[in-house]
UniProtKB/Swiss-Prot annotation:
Predominant location category: membrane
Major enzyme class: translocase
Lineage, top ranks: Bacteria, Bacillati, Actinomycetota, Actinomycetes, Mycobacteriales
Gene (name only): nuoH
Subunit structure: NDH-1 is composed of 14 different subunits. Subunits NuoA, H, J, K, L, M, N constitute the membrane sector of the complex.
PANTHER family, per database record: NADH DEHYDROGENASE SUBUNIT 1, NADH-UBIQUINONE OXIDOREDUCTASE CHAIN 1
Family named by the database record: Belongs to the complex I subunit 1 family.
Location in or out of the cell: Cell membrane
PROSITE patterns membership: COMPLEX1_ND1_1, COMPLEX1_ND1_2
Annotated organism of origin: Mycobacterium tuberculosis (strain ATCC 25177 / H37Ra)
Identification of the protein by name: NADH-quinone oxidoreductase subunit H
InterPro entries per record: NADH_UbQ_OxRdtase_su1/FPO (IPR001694), NADH_UbQ_OxRdtase_su1_CS (IPR018086)
Amino acid sequence: MTTFGHDTWWLVAAKAIAVFVFLMLTVLVAILAERKLLGRMQLRPGPNRVGPKGALQSLADGIKLALKESITPGGIDRFVYFVAPIISVIPAFTAFAFIPFGPEVSVFGHRTPLQITDLPVAVLFILGLSAIGVYGIVLGGWASGSTYPLLGGVRSTAQVISYEVAMGLSFATVFLMAGTMSTSQIVAAQDGVWYAFLLLPSFVIYLISMVGETNRAPFDLPEAEGELVAGFHTEYSSLKFAMFMLAEYVNMTTVSALAATLFFGGWHAPWPLNMWASANTGWWPLIWFTAKVWGFLFIYFWLRATLPRLRYDQFMALGWKLLIPVSLVWVMVAAIIRSLRNQGYQYWTPTLVFSSIVVAAAMVLLLRKPLSAPGARASARQRGDEGTSPEPAFPTPPLLAGATKENAGG
């Protein structure tokens, strides 16, 4: 923490511009990579018209959206309608100020860390900024004056509230083991072993929560095309729609960078590259960090291409009935092991690893259990009393048994 606060103004400005350029380039490449990967998985070429093999397609789409006519629907709250995309974008970019890209380097004779700033509670600050971004979504849905955007905004609010609880609990074990909430110090604490191995349940819970937090498939319920047209941004077009899309991909990059920081050693080189003496010095760590971020972005693309969208009740059941209870149990286990470590217990590392494997295996077994009971529902249909089944049938209200029989007979 003592290395921050001593940079000259031009160095801080240069780092801020570098982070902005990094995020913009990452978004452009991520959109193209996602479309190419989806095309490959669906046995089609993907974008291949603009530039060599479609390499400039994302840039062309951005220019197209910026130059399109801005259509404003009638009967809206104009101020909130126009401010909502800005509220979504600003927190997404701001959160990256606390992400460490690398160690101290020399820039024109000045020693400076590859990080804009840090705080004793930096991770909590990032968590708060991610929560602020949902205000732009819900305000955009409410200000549009239409039913589908409003439903999408309400869904997004419930989604973020539900999964931020599980995400915060996954952070708690990291804080316990590292003894700090500073991102740079958490990276320093993983110099030996990454927390993805020591705190496996926290990593799995965070991995699921970060997909739900960013409204991505299979948790893209706020913009479910088959139910809500386009969700909260149905009434947005031109540059305002592009800002919502930009915020989504920047948020994906932010949570991916946070996953690399908290669980994958941040900018530390992976094995066996860490055996090289210069792997964690100079500008090399920037390459390792970027590779880790892109690894998590690939998980996003892979999930979108392979998994169907969950129903809303299944999604909420996953968060409240599985992730949060398992997180609470795991926090207590990690706290006990941390207490034993403080009292001089020598075998705390193998004990923690064994506990991680046990809790993670239990969570996987619980994940294999269906979130709804299709067998019970099928037997209820055969008996003709589906309406009296205790299983919820969201979003369609259950029919009365008599009405079901009449419809079957008619």
